[in-house]
Amino acid sequence: MFPESDVLENLKIAGYLKKRKEVKASIEYVFDMFPALSKLKTRKAGFMSGGEQQMLAIGMALVVRP
């Protein structure tokens, strides 16, 4: 997680090796799983609470889909 980047940027960074369509679909999936995170799209990760940061970290892992 990059504290100086916002939620959407962090999710895009997590999927940088994937195709754009896949990343977009994965990000939508993350926002469906974590509706609270979708409301924080423009918030910098460093200014989020610990629980919100955990949601973002899990969301980033889901974008990668190992």
Please identify what each model-predicted range represents.
Residues L37-K41:
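Signature (C-motif/LSGGQ) region and adjacent switch/coupling loops
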Residues Q53-M55:
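ABC ATPase nucleotide-binding domain signature region
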Residues K44-M48:
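Conserved ABC ATPase signature
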